[in-house]
Structures are given as C-alpha cells and as structure tokens.
Amino acid sequence: MLHIGGKTFTSRLLLGTGKYPSFEVQKEAVNVSEAEILTFAVRRMNIFEASQPNFLEQLDLSKYTLLPNTAGASTADEAVRIARLAKASGLCDMIKVEVIGCSRSLLPDPVETLKASEMLLEEGFIVLPYTSDDVVLARKLEELGVHAIMPGASPIGSGQGLLNPLNLSFIIEQAKVPVIIDAGVGSPKDAAYAMELGADAVLLNTAVSGAKDPVKMAKAMKLAIESGRLGFEAGRIPLKNYGTASSPQEGMPAF
C-alpha cells in the first residue's frame, strides 16, 4: 500500500494527463493503468469554465484522487497562487509543487521549491514537491514536513531514464516519507528499475502519452512497476566479480 498524507492507495503508478492524442485514448490509458492518482497542470485546465471540455468530464472522479500541479510557475509566489486556485475549485487539497528554474532543461528551482513548499504547508496543503536528485535538498524538504518527495530521474519529457541511480538510492534510503520517482522515465525498464531501487511509486506522463500505443504502454508501465516492487521486496542476489555454480557439487561422480 502507498500512504500519502493520510490517504491510502493500492496502485504505485501515478499518471499524468497531458499530451494524449485524444480524450478517448487518454481515458482508455487511464483505465488500463489502474492508476488511482491522476495529475494535471492547473494552468492548462478550464476548471471554472463549464463550457470548455476537459479530461475530468471523461472520468468517474469517484475512482480517482486528483493531484493538481503548479507547472508553469517559476517562483514560489506563482506556485502558491496556482495551488490556491486548484484548492478553490474543490478538486483536492493535495498539490504537486513544480517550480521550474530553467526553461530549457525544465529542472526545478531548489530555492523557490523550498519556499513554495513551506508556504503551502502552512496553509494546510498535502505537499508533494518535484525536486532534483539532490540528496541534501530532499532531506531539507522532508524536514519542512512535506508528505512525499518527488525526485526527477532525468529532465521532464526527456525519456533518458535514471541518470543518477546512486543519488536516488541515497534519497530513498534516508527518507521517512514516500519517494515518488518523477520525470524522465521513458520505458518500462526505467520504471521497474526505479521500483527495484526501493522507490514507493513512479509518476509518468510523456512515456505513456507519447508512445506509439499509449494504451498498451500504460499496461506495460503498470506491470513494470508491480514487478519492480516485487523484486525489491524479494531482495536481489548480491553482485559478485566471479561466477558461482547454482548446481550442488556434492554427489558428483568421480572420473
């Protein structure tokens, strides 16, 4: 089970809702993924305009927890304003804090992310900050009281996978709150690897929505995350420099 801010979830896959080729494909991908948490950019949603279609109208919202994000914010103040807008819509009190510090790499601004997280915690939000793989920053965010840490595997939408698994493993090892690998996952292999490291969950968007067959990829990611988690719980064998025979040596005939 995945526990975030007093809420409990069965699925360890969080799914983004942007850039799908159609509402129909999006809805089917969400269904087969069996994700329970769906994230979306508040700035791209007409949450107060009933005449404008959006993906929320396509879903049975009783089955999902919505995770608005502050994509588009470049300062803490902007992120807080976006979060307040999402909360005012009545959708959810959870917020993914996303404050971008570089428009080219889309890497997060560490200082503004810390500030935004602190401000939103004071306002009673369930705060999930998107951050880099900086181990010290992750610790400082946890010390603030965030409800989960979301380090990026690599730049958003890059599909480069886990560029620094060592740092991610350090973050996972030290954290007392859930660690959700977010950004840069490109394939089921990446998702499984993140879970094998001990991550509590993986958040995906482009890897599914940008695939040739988003629905099939959503299913593949679901299975990869489940198998990666099982592998982590089972415990892999230690790495060795030399081979070790798997067959017993006792009872072998002498020639």
Swiss-Prot record:
Disulfide pattern: none
EC category name: transferase
Residues that bind 1-deoxy-D-xylulose 5-phosphate: 157, 183-184, 205-206
Annotated catalysed reactions: [ThiS sulfur-carrier protein]-C-terminal-Gly-aminoethanethioate + 2-iminoacetate + 1-deoxy-D-xylulose 5-phosphate = [ThiS sulfur-carrier protein]-C-terminal Gly-Gly + 2-[(2R,5Z)-2-carboxy-4-methylthiazol-5(2H)-ylidene]ethyl phosphate + 2 H2O + H(+)
Pathway, per record: Cofactor biosynthesis; thiamine diphosphate biosynthesis
GO molecular-function terms, A-Z: thiazole synthase activity
Tree of life domain: Bacteria
Keyword Plastid: no
EC number: 2.8.1.10
GO CC term, one of those recorded: cytoplasm
Alphabetized UniProt keyword annotations: Cytoplasm, Schiff base, Thiamine biosynthesis, Transferase
Localisation: Cytoplasm
GO biological process, one term: thiamine diphosphate biosynthetic process
Pfam families the UniProt entry points to: ThiG
Keyword Cytoplasm carried by entry: yes
Residues of the active site: 96
Record-stated family: Belongs to the ThiG family.
Role description: Catalyzes the rearrangement of 1-deoxy-D-xylulose 5-phosphate (DXP) to produce the thiazole phosphate moiety of thiamine. Sulfur is provided by the thiocarboxylate moiety of the carrier protein ThiS. In vitro, sulfur can be provided by H(2)S.
Subunit and interaction comment: Homotetramer. Forms heterodimers with either ThiH or ThiS.
Record HAMAP family: ThiG
Annotated protein name in UniProt: Thiazole synthase
Organism: Bacillus pumilus (strain SAFR-032)
Organismal lineage: Bacteria, Bacillati, Bacillota, Bacilli, Bacillales
Gene of this entry: thiG
